[in-house]
Amino acid sequence: VLNEEGSAFLRKRSESGYVGLINQAATCYLNSLLQTLFTTPELRHRVYAFRYNSDVHGPADRCIPLQLQELFARLQFGSRPATATTALTHAFGWSRSQGAQQQDVQELCMVLFEALDRFLEQSGGGPATKITDLYRGRCQNFIRSLEAAAGDEAEPTTFCKYHPDPFLTLSLPVKGVGDVGAALQKAFEPDVLDGDNQYFCEDLDKKIDAEKGSVVESLPPILMLHLKRFDFDYETLRRVKVNDRCAIPEIIDMDTTLAGAKYNVAGHQFGAYELASIMNHSGSAAGGHYRAFVRGDRPDNHGKWFDFNDAHVSEMSEAEVARMFGRDDGAPTAEDTE
């Protein structure tokens, strides 16, 4: 009797033109992440540019970028409908039991990026080859006094403090926002520190009413947004999932979206981003299943969307795409999007 892995190797590549990834037990989150990374040409090219040297990078079976290279090659040129990720997870140092445990996909992404950059730096490729450069933006976190300066009731400038905050992902609230644009605007609304929660200003040696927030200074070539679907309920002391509807636009104009930010950085033009992929979680905070919805990355399929569901890859119907973007008001659009 053939298991899923064995049967996948006997079949031909799917009609979608893409190769799926076999689930080791609970690695759907890893599979979804890998498919979104593979279908990002800029990242794929940097992975392919890596040159393995055993004297520098150690054993081949423990070299993460080499194993990712080989996996990407099978995804791009393989003739079977699905391929395995076991060589890559072995390079991670995972045991068999770790393949049966679902992990945080955002945390895994950050750890993978750091590991890839570490190997690339060992190669002497320079900063231009860093994976994180594709995703790194910069915010300025601030605390600003709400108390007017002496003699000037109109200008609250008694205190203002900024410090840089580089990021690889922007984490956005989804509860009650309705869509990603509103989530971005809410993320950059400053918090007011007053009453019992006043800010102690060391420069002024007293507590003051203040605002604490963040402004965008620069955005990366590839913008990765994290919708904060998981929260902690302090009454039940349990992790819970926020299932509020959050519509996702195909194109988001960051200049228009951030124009309403209270302390938007004047003169910065951020441009627009086209949605390339979504990692979708269905289920509860206790467990569930990840899939990736990906826009075709080739000239012959750029207008099409594909559902990467572990070993199975299929083209999405117009109705499925409409539901994903929030065009069907009767459907609970994107409530599960991670």
Question: Could you describe each region identified by the protein language model?
Answer:
Residues V1-S16, L37, F50-P59, R74-S79, ...:
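Exposed substrate/partner-binding surface patches
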Residues L2-E5, T39, L43-P166, F200-D205:
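Papain-like cysteine protease catalytic cores
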Residues G17-I22, S95-S97:
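Short, conserved non-catalytic motifs in the polymerase core
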Residues Y18, K130-D133, M279:
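Catalytic micro-motifs at enzyme active sites that drive phosphoryl/nucleotidyl and oxygen chemistry
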Residues L21-T36, A100-V111, G287-Y290:
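Active-site nucleophilic cysteine motif
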